[in-house]
């Protein structure tokens, strides 16, 4: 399968630096909102990253998936737990979403190394 989670994440990070330099106030507002949403509250930060992974799959976002997988791995989620959670996205989005679950599996393979 032609999918490069590490390359996708690297390119995303490079482009985000350009966006930060071009529109710093808007970029900072986005980062603050992201930090607020992903910080622990009633739900743990770990749980929120799993929810973000499932949301990324449901949204069919190939750029979001490796970033969410990396955060999930760093938070201690197992491959089995992540894939099981992603099946909820398939329940909501149907078989076309299953193709994005394969991107999760690929990202887990590459980012676990």
Spans of model-derived segments:
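Iron-sulfur (Fe-S) cluster-binding segments and ferredoxin-like electron-carrier domains
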Residues: 67-79
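Acidic, glycine/proline-rich low-complexity segments that act as flexible tails and inter-domain linkers
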Residues: 1-47, 99-113
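C-terminal structural segments of small proteins and small subunits
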Residues: 83-107
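Alpha-helical scaffold segments that form or flank carboxylate-/histidine-based iron centers
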Residues: 48-56, 85-91
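Alpha-helix N-capping/helix-start residues
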Residues: 45, 79-80
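Residues at alpha-helix boundaries and short interhelical turns
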Residues: 20, 41, 58-62, 76
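Short, thiol/selenol-centered motifs that function as redox-active sites or metal-ligating centers
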Residues: 51, 55-67
């Amino acid at each position: 399968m032609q999918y490069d989670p590490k390359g996708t994440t690297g390119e995303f990070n490079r482009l985000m630096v350009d966006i930060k330099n071009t529109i710093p106030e808007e970029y900072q507002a986005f980062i603050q909102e992201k930090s607020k949403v992903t910080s622990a509250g009633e739900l743990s930060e770990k749980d929120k990253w799993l929810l973000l992974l499932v949301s990324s799959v449901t949204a069919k976002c190939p750029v979001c998936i490796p970033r969410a997988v990396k955060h999930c791995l760093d938070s201690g989620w197992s491959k089995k737990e992540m894939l099981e959670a992603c099946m909820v996205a398939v329940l909501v989005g149907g078989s076309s979403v299953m193709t994005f679950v394969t991107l999760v599996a690929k990202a887990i393979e590459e980012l676990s190394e």
